[in-house]
Regions:
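Helix-to-loop junctions at the C-terminal end of transmembrane segments
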Residues: 49-62, 145, 246-258, 338
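Symmetry-related core transmembrane helices of the 12-TM Major Facilitator Superfamily/SLC fold
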Residues: 153-170, 347-363
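Conserved MFS/SLC helix-loop-helix module at the cytosolic interface between two early adjacent transmembrane helices
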Residues: 49-87
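Structural signature of the two symmetry-related core transmembrane helices
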Residues: 64-78, 261-276
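Helix-loop junctions at membrane interfaces in 12-TM secondary transporters
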Residues: 81-92, 279-289
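Short amphipathic helix-loop junctions that connect adjacent transmembrane helices
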Residues: 19-33, 215-231
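Cytoplasmic helix-loop-helix junction between adjacent transmembrane helices
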Residues: 94-128
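A late C-terminal transmembrane helix in Major Facilitator Superfamily
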Residues: 313-343, 350
Length: 376
């Protein structure tokens, strides 16, 4: 129960401001390039978070760290939503990046510890709950705009209360399945080697796709496909719902097929489906391509996190940071591309990230029988 709350809360937090980026852009009166810098601040925060993440995991423990950083993100959200200054927005998103990166590492460490202690495979399902949080954020956004108020501060306040409630539930129930802090303080092995670099490239590319689809699909539908503002968040909804469904079945697929081959096929399907959807254009083509991308890319991150956990907690912490950087660096990259070449070109860049996943996964498939790739 606590782990489910934490994964859901992270998805709800990120999905809430991501689904309102089009409105935040208007509120701050900024261009696509400035929106790119706004999102870049989160990736810089994620990069800066790595030393703090390692220190907190060693000295505080994953459970307490998740609750602490999660509460900070909840309180940040109304400030982000009510902000009209681009410069203040950069500061707020930098802090958001630090907290989200640390929270991501903490909950994945917590999840892998549950797998180890109870001898179960649940990482994909936990990531499915994260995707459910993203989908819930999009649904809440659409519902608030349509039936309550389109004001960003109202949205921020509702999500803030919801997040704090989730963290309170996680705190009250965590005693029943908590991991010991001593487990979180294991000595960290050497982190940089061929294994972590290949795993890092894959999860970086996968989270670039995830983050870009979460942050730009609504803007793509509104600015390129020209849908109504109330329908724009449907892009996030379709993508995140598909990711949720894909991750529900990821563990069973892993028991039948080779992990590296699954990742390679996922990367290629992502590239082909998204490129085709962008080329065809139109709302329905976009929905179908977003759904296929969500179903296939959903397999990648849980497999990589599980493999990193099998190598050791240090590797898992590093890979979690790679994942946060990818998820937060992808969207501003799309913003810069959109400014100079158009948002359609930015979506093609997202599709190209799938090719990177496929190539890196083939390298894993070649070396899966060597000791350092034994978990794959």
């Amino acid at each position: 129960m606590p782990a489910l709350c934490l994964f859901f809360a992270l998805g709800l937090n990120i999905g809430s401001w991501a689904s309102r980026l089009a409105d935040l852009k208007i509120a701050m009166s900024i261009t696509d390039m400035e929106l790119g810098f706004f999102l870049l601040a989160t990736s810089l925060g994620a990069i800066s978070a790595f030393p703090l993440t390692i220190w907190l995991l060693r000295h505080v423990g994953a459970r307490k760290m998740a609750l602490l950083l999660g509460s900070v993100t909840a309180c940040l959200l109304p400030l982000i939503m009510n902000n009209t200054s681009h410069h203040l927005g950069l500061v707020l998103m930098f802090i958001e990046g630090i907290c989200c990166a640390g929270l991501n590492a903490a909950i994945n460490t917590y999840g892998s510890d549950i797998e180890r202690k109870h001898d179960i495979k649940c990482m994909s399902r936990l990531h499915a709950v994260f995707s459910l949080g993203l989908a819930a954020a999009a649904l809440i956004s659409m519902g608030l705009i349509r039936f309550v108020s389109s004001e960003l501060i109202v949205h921020g306040a509702v999500i803030c209360v919801s997040l704090l409630t989730l963290f309170a539930v996680a705190y009250r129930t965590s005693e029943q399945c908590r991991t010991s802090d001593s487990d979180d303080k294991q000595p960290e092995p050497k982190l940089i080697n061929k294994t972590t670099l290949v795993l890092g490239i894959i999860v970086l590319s996968a989270t670039i796709i995830e983050g870009s689809m979460n942050d730009w699909s609504a803007i793509y539908l509104k600015d390129v496909i020209d849908v109504s503002p109330s329908l724009a968040p449907s892009g996030v909804l379709v993508f995140s719902a598909a990711m949720f469904i894909g991750r529900l079945f990821a563990d069973s697929l892993r028991s039948q097929y080779n992990d590296a081959i699954l990742i390679a096929f996922a990367g290629l399907i992502v590239s082909l489906s998204l490129a085709t959807g962008v080329w065809l254009s139109g709302l329905y083509a976009s929905w179908v391509s977003f759904a296929i991308v969500g179903l296939t890319v959903s397999l990648v991150s849980p497999i990589i996190y599980a493999s990193a956990a099998a190598i050791g907690p240090g590797c898992l912490s590093l890979i979690s940071t790679f994942g946060s950087i990818g998820g937060l660096a992808g969207p501003p990259t799309i913003g810069f591309i959109a400014t100079h070449f158009g948002l359609t070109s930015g979506m093609y860049f997202v599709a190209a990230s799938g090719v990177v996943i496929g190539i890196a996964a083939l390298k894993l498939a070649k070396h899966q029988h060597t000791p350092q790739y034994a978990s794959l």
